[in-house]
UniProtKB/Swiss-Prot annotation:
Taxonomic path: Eukaryota, Amoebozoa, Evosea, Eumycetozoa, Dictyostelia
Example of a GO MF term: threonine-tRNA ligase activity
BP-aspect Gene Ontology terms: threonyl-tRNA aminoacylation
Matches recorded under Gene3D superfamilies: 3.10.20.30, Anticodon-binding domain, Bira Bifunctional Protein, Domain 2, Threonyl-trna Synthetase, Chain A, domain 2
Sequence intervals crossing the membrane: none
Catalytic reactions on record: tRNA(Thr) + L-threonine + ATP = L-threonyl-tRNA(Thr) + AMP + diphosphate + H(+)
Entry annotated with the keyword Cell inner membrane: no
Family: Belongs to the class-II aminoacyl-tRNA synthetase family.
Designated name of the protein: Probable threonine--tRNA ligase 1, cytoplasmic
Stretches for region Disordered: 1-35
Keywords, comma-separated and alphabetical: Aminoacyl-tRNA synthetase, ATP-binding, Cytoplasm, Ligase, Nucleotide-binding, Protein biosynthesis
Compositionally biased spans, kind Basic and acidic residues: 18-33
Taxonomic superkingdom: Eukaryota
Top-rank EC class of the record's enzyme: ligase
């Protein structure tokens, strides 16, 4: 719930809490009956509760329209991003009207708006006061969120018509939208997609308007008395607050909005997949059916999306990981990857790379325990806020937990003896194994796991050192991401309303971060009030070759842990001999597992030589060349590179083809000619024939490529 002030409608979120996804429904509940196929929309039955819900809505809408008749027209001023001020009328002029006054083309291209830089607003909803107004097209973050949220309502209406179950939540996501429904023993299957799409398309063609009302809590409870999931959400709203509802066609839903003006804006709609889920993400709660979808303002974008998804499927790290024998998962240890020899090579290389940079950049590597008493987590504050995500074990009549993060342990290390200002900045780095109790349904390959390692570091420094340390962190991050070929964006998140600490300290810290970002010289965005309660932060989003955004690196200031652990250092200030340090939380790879998944998909499994688990393979023409081939393989291996040999009886063309499919960087063919010249015939996985090279020259080339991270 966002806005709970008296006399203001509660902007009820469509998604109250993430709902854990489980196995695909068709796999988990094969024996349960699928929905009866009805073929066309006209044969579908409208549930009785829908009729009652609409009757209540129409009554409330009539009262609302009647109340507007007595409302006096009051002028308002609407300020656009370019500074232009447009006159409007309170509770009458809409963002669409403002856009239409500029040009009809602009009006037809926007799907959402933002009022006063914060609240996303329907373009068909009248403005209520003087404001700053930003008009948002589909390609903006606000535009996509609004567009896909509206599409979720279309999906929800279609599911009500087809299945007649109880809708739960239906949010927009970063990749489209979904809706959950309680359906008893019924399940959704891939065979249903065609019918869902047909019904959704009919809803689009009907050009159903999205209408909004703010109603008293008691009326909302009456309207949704048939749906225990909606009433559970409503019951959490304070009695004196109003509830925001939206209607399109036969669907009335709890929703904070905003939405597009009508369903015809959704030009292209498709169901993409389905699964089962738990209500409120808890395994002890009811089973739900989840249907995912995607939509766009035109069919061309849908075609581009489908092409993108085909390419993404080819690069999916789970498929590549299996094909290249890098890792696997087992139900005996959900969310914990088994890294096979070739996957371990990549994993270790990433860690070694960061470790070498630590040595160059003044970080001190430490090793901390994996299990701590509950008392530590109570002192750090994590027990109160994070215990449900921790693995807790009873030990010696006390509760212990596997650590989900390293920072409290590093605080104990800093506080283990008296510290001097001469030791600062003190940079602790830790590759310790972390465990977080993620919901089973949320586990996804290497990107969402329970056991992982981070390139985690905590910098203990003075307030005066913040700017230089942040600059150093940004430079470190830029160097690493440059090697991987990632573009990145920066965002500064400042003091939230629930901040802890002194405002003066926050002001100094935020100014230091801003100076560091400006000095760094890359564009950055401001996210007001989006920092953590314990300090401001810089969020870094990388972009892969498919233009997908991932957040891996974090740079976070922390004023609270030094207070909680009573950390001090001996200062050189005679007026204040003891001072508290500031902590900078810093990671670049983030989770090594997640970064490995991103790199697999970024490279498509075609690893650059420096990090490749299969750098070279010697391929013999026939068995008479095997002895020389083994000699070459050993020389390359002894030089520190991964080299295999295929001295089987297969044909040379088949050996080469299999080596290319296995993504060996270099394929070294040896026959009698190579034996005579003490050389190898070099070709690449992309079938580029390089010709003959001596083994020493080849090893020198390998060393240079590794040195250049190629």
């Amino acid at each position: 719930m966002s806005d709970s002030q008296e006399n203001k409608p509660v902007e009820t979120p469509t998604e109250v809490k993430p709902v854990a996804e489980k196995k695909p429904a068709a796999e988990k509940k094969e024996k349960k009956p699928a929905v009866k196929k009805v073929g066309v929309m006209e044969t579908l039955q409208t549930p009785d509760y829908v009729k009652e819900r609409i009757e209540i809505w129409e009554s409330l809408k009539a009262k609302h329209l009647e109340s507007l008749k007595d409302m006096k027209e009051e002028p308002i001023n609407v300020t656009l991003p370019d500074g232009k001020v447009v006159a409007g009328i309170k509770n009458k002029t809409t963002p669409y009207d403002i856009a239409k006054g500029i040009s009809r083309g602009l009006a037809d291209s926007i799907v959402s708006s933002k009022v006063n830089g914060e609240q996303i607003w329907d373009i068909s909803r009248p403005l209520e006061a003087d404001c700053n107004l930003q008009l948002c097209k589909f390609d903006s973050e606000e535009g996509k969120k609004t567009f896909w949220h509206s599409s979720a309502h279309i999906l929800g209406q279609a599911m009500e018509r087809i299945y007649g179950g109880q809708l739960c939540i239906g949010p927009a996501t970063s990749e489209g939208f979904y809706y959950d429904m309680a359906m008893g023993d019924k399940i959704v299957s891939a065979e249903d997609y065609k019918l869902i799409n047909e019904v959704a398309q009919k809803i689009v063609q009907e050009k159903q308007p999205f209408e909004r009302l703010a109603v008293p809590r008691d009326i909302a409870l009456t309207m949704f008395k048939f749906n225990k999931y909606k009433t559970e959400i409503i019951s959490k709203i304070p009695q004196e607050d109003t509830v925001s509802l939206y209607r399109c066609g036969t669907l009335v839903d709890l929703c904070r909005g905003p939405h597009v003006p009508n369903t015809s804006y959704i030009k292209s709609f498709a169901v993409t997949k389905n699964s089962s889920a738990y209500w409120l993400g808890k395994a002890e709660n009811d089973d739900l059916q989840r249907v995912y979808g995607i939509s766009f303002p035109d069919k061309k974008q849908m075609e581009e999306y489908e092409n993108f998804m085909r390419e993404a499927a080819l690069r999916d790290h789970r498929n590549v990981g299996k094909a290249q024998e890098l890792f696997f998962f087992h139900p005996y240890s959900p969310g914990s990857a088994f890294f096979l020899p070739h996957g371990t090579r990549i994993y270790n290389k990433l860690v070694e790379f960061i470790r070498e940079e630590y040595h160059r950049r003044g970080f001190t590597e430490v090793i901390s325990p994996s299990i701590f008493s509950q008392k530590l987590w109570e002192q750090s504050g994590h027990w109160q806020k994070y215990s449900e995500n921790m693995f807790v074990l009873p030990v010696d009549k006390d509760n212990f937990s596997l650590k989900p993060m390293n920072c409290p342990g590093h605080c104990l290390m800093f506080g283990s003896r008296q510290r001097s200002y001469r030791e600062l900045p003190l940079r602790f780095a830790d590759f310790g194994v972390l465990h977080r109790n993620e919901l089973a349904g949320a586990l996804t390959g290497l990107t969402r796991v329970r056991k992982f390692q981070q390139d985690d570091a905590h910098i203990f420094c003075t307030t005066e050192m913040i700017e230089d340390e942040i600059n150093s962190c940004l430079g470190f991050m830029q160097y690493v991401y440059g090697i991987f070929g990632f573009e990145f964006g920066l965002e500064l998140s400042t003091r939230p309303d629930n901040f802890l600490g002194e405002i003066a300290q926050w002001d100094i810290a935020e100014a230091s971060l801003e100076k560091a970002l400006n000095k760094f010289g890359k564009p950055w965005k401001l996210n007001p009030k989006d920092g953590a309660f314990y300090g401001p932060k810089i969020d870094i989003h990388i972009t892969d070759c498919l233009k997908r955004s991932h957040q891996c690196a974090t740079i976070q200031l922390d004023f609270q842990l030094p207070i909680r652990f009573d950390l001090e250092y001996q200062s050189d200030d005679a007026a204040e001999l003891k001072k508290r340090p500031v902590i900078i939380h810093r990671a670049i790879l983030g989770s090594v597992e997640r970064m490995m998944a991103i790199l697999i998909e970024h490279t498509g499994g075609k690893w650059p030589l420096w990090v490749s688990p299969r750098q070279a393979i010697v391929v013999t023409v026939n068995k008479t060349h095997n002895e020389y081939g083994q000699k070459v393989c050993k020389e390359i291996s002894d030089a520190g590179f991964y080299c295999d040999i295929d001295d089987s009886d297969k044909t040379i063309s088949k050996k080469v083809r299999e080596a290319q499919l296995a993504q060996y960087n270099y394929i070294l063919v040896v026959g009698q000619e190579e034996i005579n010249g003490n050389t190898v015939n070099v070709r690449t996985r992309d079938n580029v024939v390089r010709g003959s090279l001596t083994v020493n020259d080849l090893i020198s080339e390998f060393k240079q490529l590794v040195k250049e991270f190629k």
